[in-house]
């Protein structure tokens, strides 16, 4: 058949039509039922006429390539992780959502959240993804920048001051800053007054942009030491270690992952998955995965080191803010037997919807 090669990838690419058809049927059967497919059943459903013996020969070649395996003696075949990746890359057809499907997603996320704050909308997005995927729907939200209300500089030592930033909902952030040599108390007050005059109703990134546009005003209104103080105050808040990092994971549909578990080993893998999801580093890793490419990313089993022990698949896409920055991610986690062709466009559209809605509410 000409599929044996020193390069597995070359051999896979050279699979003939009947090998591809048999492989495709095995994977589709697995995704639909989770059960192995044997040569006798395959010979009945193939579009070409092949005996069970001929099918077994093809299956043997596919197994040698690492695309399929036999879960136990005398069983049919299931796809390996490599086989699933090959199927997703080479065979899977992802279509556009129908108008009805888009309207259904819009309705669930918009209406069920009742126009409430962003967190309610994210909850509904996670719940909706869980419902359509039969996996666990997830939404990761990044730390949002508070709307600024007031700033104050309090001298602690001759060369140090406490910069106090008060945001909407009375969030307070304190940072210690180094003072320029020779700065006076009146200059501390002058710098704070200048910031307060320009910060009302703005986030810190917006304030930074505005001050950049107002360079001439800054030069005219403030002396050199006060200008330096303003820049130091903004810089120390911009350097917050939590800025832009995910702070919340919203996950719905964990019970879906309990369905179809075969025994203690599956329960242990599921426990590992839940443990991973509770770690802060895991949230950052998921967001990094979403950022590492355009559109929807698919990670199968151990391709994603985060979930390699639990053998789970992750389908994830980023959502963005008004400045087109990635500020979070939506996705689905589940067993490798996910309906990838259906879930991918759902995740993609949901990410776009969340981007639009969060921009209007943030």
Curated annotation (Swiss-Prot):
It comes from Rhizobium johnstonii (strain DSM 114642 / LMG 32736 / 3841) (Rhizobium leguminosarum bv. viciae). SUPFAM superfamilies: GAF domain-like, Winged helix' DNA-binding domain. The lineage of its organism: Bacteria, Pseudomonadati, Pseudomonadota, Alphaproteobacteria, Hyphomicrobiales. It comes from the Bacteria. Belongs to the HrcA family. This is Heat-inducible transcription repressor HrcA. The gene is hrcA. Negative regulator of class I heat shock genes (grpE-dnaK-dnaJ and groELS operons). Prevents heat-shock induction of these operons. GO terms for biological process: negative regulation of DNA-templated transcription. Keywords: Repressor, Stress response, Transcription, Transcription regulation. It holds the Pfam family HrcA.
């Amino acid at each position: 058949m000409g599929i044996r090669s020193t390069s597995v990838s070359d051999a896979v690419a050279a699979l003939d039509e009947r090998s591809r058809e048999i492989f495709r049927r095995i994977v589709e059967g697995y995704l639909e039922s989770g059960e192995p497919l044997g040569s006798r059943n395959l010979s009945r459903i193939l579009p070409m006429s092949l005996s069970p013996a001929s099918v077994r020969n093809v299956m043997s070649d596919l197994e040698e390539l690492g695309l399929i395996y036999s879960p136990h003696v005398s069983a049919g075949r299931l796809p390996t992780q490599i086989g699933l990746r090959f199927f997703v890359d080479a065979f899977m057809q992802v279509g556009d959502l129908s108008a009805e499907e888009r309207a259904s997603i819009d309705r669930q996320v918009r209406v069920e959240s009742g126009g409430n704050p962003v967190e309610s909308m994210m909850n509904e997005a996670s719940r909706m993804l869980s419902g359509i995927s039969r996996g666990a729907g997830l939404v990761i939200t990044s730390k949002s920048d508070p709307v600024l209300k007031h700033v104050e500089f309090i001298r602690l030592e001759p060369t140090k001051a406490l910069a106090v930033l008060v945001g909407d909902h009375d969030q307070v952030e304190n940072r210690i800053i180094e003072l320029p040599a020779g700065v006076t108390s009146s200059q501390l007050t002058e710098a704070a007054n200048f910031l307060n005059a320009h910060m009302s109703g703005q986030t810190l990134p917006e304030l930074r942009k505005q001050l950049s546009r107002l360079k001439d005003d800054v030069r005219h209104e403030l002396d050199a030491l006060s200008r330096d103080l303003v820049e130091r105050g903004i810089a120390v808040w911009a350097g917050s270690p939590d800025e832009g990092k995910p702070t919340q994971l919203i996950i719905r549909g964990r019970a879906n992952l309990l369905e179809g578990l075969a025994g203690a080993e599956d329960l242990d893998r599921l426990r590992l998955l839940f443990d991973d999801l509770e770690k802060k580093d895991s949230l950052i890793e998921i967001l990094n995965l979403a950022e590492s490419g355009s559109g929807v990313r698919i990670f199968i089993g151990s391709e994603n080191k985060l979930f390699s022990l639990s053998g789970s698949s992750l389908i994830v896409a980023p959502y963005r803010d008004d400045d087109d920055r990635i500020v979070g991610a939506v996705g689905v986690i589940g067993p490798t037997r996910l309906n990838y062709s259906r879930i991918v466009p759902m995740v993609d559209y949901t990410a776009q919807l969340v981007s639009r809605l969060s921009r209007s509410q943030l």
